[in-house]
Amino acid sequence: MEIAVIGNSEFILGFRLAGIRKTYAATDDERLHEHITSVLQDPEVGILVLNSTDMERLPRRLQSTLENSVRPTVIAIGGSEGDMSLREKIKRSVGVDLWK
């Protein structure tokens, strides 16, 4: 299972430096949508990391698909959703509340 990261070049740089190979630079909304569609179809990806501002720019239907996705589990970083959203996603993905 691999981690994929989609975002602007500044957002994905740290993930590249940490050794994540599947990083995709999205310079505009069209590229963002293309990369997300591609990653959702990749059976090797277990976690998809997005910038929360990119997530907010997506059409509501795609946002809903990503929010409800279990494989890959989609994590939006940097927004006001905070720990509760991440907690719920991990609980849904793993089946156990790791915070308890």
Swiss-Prot record:
Keyword Transport: yes
Keyword terms: ATP synthesis, Cell membrane, Hydrogen ion transport, Ion transport, Membrane, Transport
Family annotation (Pfam families): ATP-synt_F
UniProt main location, coarse: membrane
Annotated compartments: Cell membrane
Source domain of life: Archaea
Family from the record: Belongs to the V-ATPase F subunit family.
UniProt xrefs under HAMAP family: ATP_synth_F_arch (MF_00312)
Assembly and interaction partners: Has multiple subunits with at least A(3), B(3), C, D, E, F, H, I and proteolipid K(x).
Protein name: A-type ATP synthase subunit F
